[in-house]
From Swiss-Prot:
Its cofactor is Mg(2+). The keyword Isomerase does not apply. The lineage of its organism: Bacteria, Pseudomonadati, Pseudomonadota, Alphaproteobacteria, Hyphomicrobiales. This is Orotate phosphoribosyltransferase. Orotate binds at T137. It comes from Rhizobium meliloti (strain 1021). It catalyses: orotidine 5'-phosphate + diphosphate = orotate + 5-phospho-alpha-D-ribose 1-diphosphate. Pathway: Pyrimidine metabolism; UMP biosynthesis via de novo pathway; UMP from orotate: step 1/2. Coiled coil: none annotated. Pfam families: Pribosyltran. Its EC number is 2.4.2.10.
């Protein structure tokens, strides 16, 4: 169970950023940009799935996730924790254990045989469900799972991402307009701040990353990626 130690939010963000650098989950590559699934060109890439392979780090991150939810959403607001296929599943299991709640997971699509289920596990009608993902850019992938839960009779008013890109100012407002408050621990700003503090890259690379964070679609367009993107 969660220890109820409520670390300061800024401290949690900085520590998670440092942990992500420590396990080499973060990559900066301004001279040869990554191409994201959205079509955007990006000088940054993160693999939060690596967290599951580092027990001490994953334990700390999940403690921070529990603290974030209890502080920002409340102690008795949820009946079930849900993770999306596949990256969200292990984090849902760990967060559910800390919060003392049941867990379900949501497939990207019904499995197509047997019960043709999209939701695995037991979710009572009207259950208040907390959805967790390892990371989110604008909430689009999270809403695929939220829509499935709502269609099955669950109530979703909160989602949490361990890492939030925080590059589109309208993203959280869009989620709020659909009835969901987004919570998160760390962002690219935290990761960049640690990179500067520890001098992990040359100044040119750091400045390019900051330029991307300030105007991601402009940066993408200048570097061969899409110049427009519907933030849903």
């Amino acid at each position: 169970m969660f220890s109820n130690a409520f670390t300061d939010k800024a401290v949690m963000a900085e520590l998670v950023a440092k942990m992500l650098w420590e396990i080499k989950a973060v990559h900066f590559r301004a001279d040869e940009p990554y191409r994201l699934a959205s079509g955007m060109a990006s000088p940054v890439y993160i693999d939060c799935r690596k967290l599951v392979s580092y027990p001490r780090i994953r334990s700390a991150v999940m403690d921070f996730a529990a603290a974030t939810i209890l502080r920002e959403a409340g102690f008795e607001q949820f009946d079930v924790v849900a993770g999306g296929e596949t990256a969200g599943i292990p984090f849902a299991a760990m967060l559910a254990e800390r919060l003392g709640l049941p867990m379900i997971y949501v497939r990207k699509a019904p499995k197509g045989h047997g019960r043709n289920a999209q939701i695995e596990g037991y979710m009572p009608e009207g259950a208040r469900v907390l959805v967790i993902e390892d990371l989110t850019t604008a909430g689009g992938s999270m809403f695929k799972f939220i829509d499935a839960i709502r269609a099955a009779g669950g109530v979703v008013e909160h989602g949490i991402a361990l890492f939030y890109y925080d590059i589109f100012p309208e993203a959280r407002g869009n989620m709020k307009s659909k009835g969901v408050d987004l919570h998160y621990i760390a962002t690219w700003r935290n990761v960049l701040a640690v990179a500067r503090e520890l001098a992990l890259f040359d100044e040119k690379t750091l400045n390019e990353v900051e330029a991307f964070l300030n105007a991601p679609l402009d940066w993408s367009g200048r570097n061969g990626g899409v110049r427009a993107l519907a933030v849903q």
